[in-house]
Amino acid sequence: MKLHRASHLLFAISVSAVTAGVAAEQFGISSREMPRISVVEPMRPFVMRAAQDIAGDMEKIFGARPEIVTGAAPEQNAIVLAKAGTGWENYAVESMPGNVLKITGSDDRGVMFGLYRFASDCLGVDPFYYWNGCEPKRAASREWKSISIRQGDPSFKFRAWFINDEDSLNGYHPETAGKRTIDYERYQVVFGPEVEEHICETAVRAGFNAIIAASYVDILNPDERKLVDVAVSRGLFQTFHHQEPCGVSGWIAKREWKLRGMQPVTYAEDPEFFHGLWRRYAEAWAKVPGVIWQIGLRGVGDRPYWVKADWHSADGWKSAEVPEEVERERAALISKAMNKQVEIITDALGHRPEHFATQLWLEGAQFFRKGYLKVPEGTCIIYADNSPGLKFGPDAGRQKRFATPAGLYYHLAVVHGNHYTQLVPPRRTHEIFSYMHEKGAKEIVIVNVSNVRPFGFTVTAAGEMMRDLGSFSAADYARRWASLRVGEGRAKGLADAIDAYFGAYELVDSRDDVSSYGAKTPRAKLALFNDGVLYARTDDILCEMEGGATDYVRIPSDIPTDDPDALTDAAKDAWHATTQDMSPYLKSRARSSERAYRQSAAFATVAARLRPYGTEFLHQARFLSIASRLYAAAAAGDWQGALWAARERDALDAEMCLGEEWRRWYDRHLIYPFRTLAARIEKIAELERGKQGKECEK
């Protein structure tokens, strides 16, 4: 039996990182005689789901599906699942005599993660295969000289995905989508349980054990409860956005005010209203296994609790200076609310919650830093980054070591920044995680993954480093990721090209300290390559031309509107560097179902050579390049140039749909709807031509 070269590379690297001097037996898989997957003792349902996943992986590779059996372990030709040892999610994957692979875990999740580790490191299955189309290579058989992988307690106990501002997911497979009941334009629908299945499978394959199943989940809405049930069935703990104490967001409160015919109230004005709402939702969430509770106090649309206006209003952003005594009073009220929430959760559960946390954000972080905010005993304090996933604020930076259980909230994607593109390099993420881990933030990491699909490279890397910070290497990870797509011989070339991609859009100087926002951050560059800011600034210009007011509070930007040439040149240079670095190393292998890029024959050639290996990076580089040109043209009043760029954006979206499966992916881009810009620009261009014609007549 012959070992597939890409899988061998993955296996060799992974095993060398976790074993030293451990002898193990040879193990092989052949389509002629598939090993059975043997579950020798009762396991929770999510372990059986994982076994089915691995059986499916083996069927894709070998053309035959292994049988899953229970009871006594076979002595020959089997993959045996059992529990052994102690610790949190520990596991071992070892080949034994008789062509047996034994996967043991200290608990059920340990067994599950051991299975998925075998799939990724030995079978070569990309955790994001569903989203990126990178399926494992077919083979009649494979053989490993030995397999011995051991994983102790993970570096971070809870490792959570946050599905946030998920406009693409909500438009994907609309036939299975459900209805929401909150008054929020972006969230009139919620993606269906079939989509959640793919999300949760990817999360556990990537090593995550917790999830915020969607933004603003309403557990009492059956369509949203289905998502929670799917996540639980996959072995994922449930947690919440920092706006959702006891599972209640400000949008739920706003709906309740309307249903009851009430005027909006703050917690200070009507605490009993909130107590009743928290109690009602805590009782529902108490029936869900594995909840990491959220406590805290924020207003509608993630505003301070004393602001009644929602996020649509500019008033919601105001942060006026107030006397110290006012800050102390506000902090005391938040502390009082948190203690009440713990009391309500305790009543709902019948015992004090085992896991509960509060996320420090804006005024919460400020009050805590000043010593005004007192949290209930046992609260895990979650510190937040600066949104682009690049630094942590002074509330974390000023502490040598955290005195309480601590964690971090980290953005690999962010709605007012890189919402559709990967811009945070794994190297930087590793620096941030290591910095926080050394201070004692080991309890939980919540990673914002937005719409999931665009972020496979960076999210998979985050999963690996959360498992074992000490052994993670960004360069090694990139090479292994590349080897799945192009093989060992070309892996370094693709890995170098990916490094060049991140370098072209580097947001923070490597000398910057991760502990604070700092003056050295190149703000203009940060604003330049950022899809959220580029859309917002372009939309501002169009609104001014249309004579309307902007309907969204704009993100501040340092891009000079009077120098569009500099913007265009920077985008052009970054795009050129990325494509030039990538193109020489990639095999020419384009699937018949994939369409080439339309901008020019040169781009079409590059795209064909990239697919299906580095397509996401090529797409995201072009996305940023065209968005930059669109803004530059609009700022210069070049409406024909802006129209060309807007149409190119539409074409780029269409090309990335990759067949019937993804044809609806961009249908509900409500947050930054680049697709709507072409029609608006066309009207403006027509008006401008009319004005010019009248001037010529004069």
Give the ranges of each region predicted by the language model.
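Bacterial N-terminal signal peptides
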Residues: 8-18
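Substrate-binding cleft of secreted/luminal carbohydrate-active enzymes
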Residues: 425-506
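An acidic-aromatic substrate-binding cleft motif
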Residues: 126-188, 194-214, 404-407
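Gly/Pro-rich turn-and-neighbor structural signature
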Residues: 222-225, 230-233, 264-403, 553, ...
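Catalytic domains of carbohydrate-active enzymes that cleave complex glycans
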Residues: 476-698
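Active-site clefts of carbohydrate-active enzymes
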Residues: 303, 402-426
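Catalytic domains of carbohydrate-active enzymes, especially glycoside hydrolases
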Residues: 187-216, 223-226, 230, 234-239, ...
